[in-house]
Amino acid sequence: MNSPFHNIGIVTRPNTPDIQDTAHTLITFLKQHGFTVYLDEVGIKEGCIYTQDTVGCHIVNKTELGQYCDLVAVLGGDGTFLSVAREIALRAVPIIGINQGHLGFLTQIPREYMTDKLLPVLEGKYLAEERILIEAALIREGKTAERAIALNDAVLSRGGAGQMIEFEVFVNREFVYTQRSDGLIVSTPTGSTAYSLAAGGPIMQAGLHAFTLVPICPQSMTNRPIAIPDTSEIEILVTQGGDARVHFDGQTHIDVQNLDRITIRRYRNPLRILHPTDYQYFKTLRQKLHWGEQLV
């Protein structure tokens, strides 16, 4: 096959029904068309891939996929997709999702049509979409204590004590407000259909260059979501945090102390997501959010 891709990485979601059969179909398909296949070692350890399917494949750590592959295919749900996206963002390697989960905003190709949808993509017939990511730093006593990136959102939230937290928000060093609430969601357009949407935030079209600041149960009802350009730098000063944390895509977190500062900006590399040529963003929203359907 005359393809712009040569080395294809595969990441699988553990504890997923029929994942071995789906992986078998994909690996066999790629080998038959002459691609070099790289497998995430965790998927093998978790029994997601038949032993015989590993023959002739390279087995690597998920963090190495961006180093060796020019395309990564995710077999799973949006959670698996998010975890892989953060790992490969450094290398700017494109990613494509095959849905083995439930909602599937990011992993959109149905597994039953997987090879039919992938063949044109591997031949170079696809739609490419760039999504911005968040880069966050935790500043403690004037020094950077932690760094993290996220595709969906960075969420400052109260901890297990259940008490409201208090913090100040700045955008480009300009004071915005002091807020008492259960927390604050800083969302990308990709994350606008996730936690942000559940908290009352707006849906932003995926290619929009913006962030939203979405309060979580604010004490003041006048605290509403705010949209800002993605060229902005956001700073959050935690004044009364208790056992607050900052969560990234709901998968990793950093513990926060009083007077910690969290700075958030756009990550230097966008994530490049590939879609079949019949992909339509608003069609996806209609299907996933059940717009225009008779519900009763």
Curated annotation (Swiss-Prot):
Q: Where in the cell is it found?
A: Cytoplasm
Presence of the UniProt keyword RNA-binding in the record: no
Q: Which domain of life is it from?
A: Bacteria
Essential cofactor(s): a divalent metal cation
State the InterPro entries in the record.
Answer: ATP-NAD_kinase_N, ATP-NAD_kinase_PpnK-typ_C, NAD/diacylglycerol_kinase_sf, NADK
Q: Which reaction does it catalyse?
A: NAD(+) + ATP = ADP + NADP(+) + H(+)
Q: What keywords are assigned to this protein?
A: ATP-binding, Cytoplasm, Kinase, NAD, NADP, Nucleotide-binding, Transferase
Q: What class of enzyme is it?
A: transferase
Q: What is its main location?
A: cytoplasm
One GO BP annotation is:
NADP biosynthetic process
Q: Name one GO cellular component term.
A: cytoplasm
* Pfam families assigned to the protein according to its UniProt record, in alphabetical order: NAD_kinase (PF01513), NAD_kinase_C (PF20143)
EC annotation from Swiss-Prot or TrEMBL: 2.7.1.23
Active-site positions on this chain: D78
Function text: Involved in the regulation of the intracellular balance of NAD and NADP, and is a key enzyme in the biosynthesis of NADP. Catalyzes specifically the phosphorylation on 2'-hydroxyl of the adenosine moiety of NAD to yield NADP.
Q: Which family does this protein fall into?
A: Belongs to the NAD kinase family.
Q: What is the protein name for this chain?
A: NAD kinase
Gene transcribed to yield this protein:
nadK
